[in-house]
Amino acid sequence: MLPQVEHELHKRRRSRNIGLLVVLLAFVALVFGLSVVKITQGDMMQGYDHRPRASMLPPDPDPPAPNAAPVAAPGTPAATQGVTQEANQ
């Protein structure tokens, strides 16, 4: 059996492939590290969902007064309860 002779082209490809492997592993490590940091600091993060955030709005100097006689939404048990009580009177 003859000894295997490695061609120069294969040597260059191997070194390029090893270089590409190092670059890809560095990229994966960077993404993993950033993900870990972002997840561990998730309580401080508020996602931007194209709506105004209440935490960013200034406090209202004249907030609306609470309703003295709240009304139940139609179709809820509390709404039908009020109708039956009025009918019984």
From Swiss-Prot:
Low complexity: bias regions: 68-79
Domain of life, per lineage: Bacteria
Region (Disordered): 47-89
Comp. bias intervals (Pro residues): 58-67
Protein name, as recorded: Uncharacterized protein 2 in cox locus
